[in-house]
A protein has these predicted regions:
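Alpha-helical cap/lid subdomain in secreted, periplasmic
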Residues: 1-123
Length: 123
């Protein structure tokens, strides 16, 4: 989990170097960066909510740095209530359950299908 586990500061310090290393070893491989999930726990823990907000802002800023450096084949998916808004998408307020993963798939699939130029069996 390269976005939810490090601090915003660590994301700022490490993301560009990580992507540049990956790009050096795999120059043509698409790199997809996805912001971290907005978690239910943030409804009750303002510190956690603010941390997720800062993590997502930090990775968005680093994606812009990478784009300005001319990194090609780099894609960014912004958090879009991936788990839904009915409080049913996690097992514990943090980790997705089956419903949460299904919702994430439905949000990610169109972008991934377009980026990788693939069709999923159910399309």
């Amino acid at each position: 989990d390269c976005i939810p586990n490090p601090s915003p500061k660590e994301i700022t310090e490490r993301a560009v170097g990580f992507v540049m290393t990956l790009r050096e070893k795999h120059p043509d491989t698409p790199i997809i960066i996805i912001q971290t999930l907005i978690r239910e726990t943030g409804n009750f823990n303002q510190k956690a909510r603010e941390n997720v907000k800062q993590q997502n802002e930090a990775i968005a800023e680093q994606v812009e740095v990478l784009r300005k450096k001319g990194v090609k084949n780099l894609y960014f998916i912004k958090e879009d209530r991936f788990l839904g808004t009915d409080h049913e998408g996690t097992i514990d307020g943090t980790h997705p359950n089956d419903l949460g993963f299904d919702r994430m798939l439905k949000k990610y699939k169109p972008a991934i299908s377009k980026i990788l130029k693939i069709k999923f069996r159910d399309e």
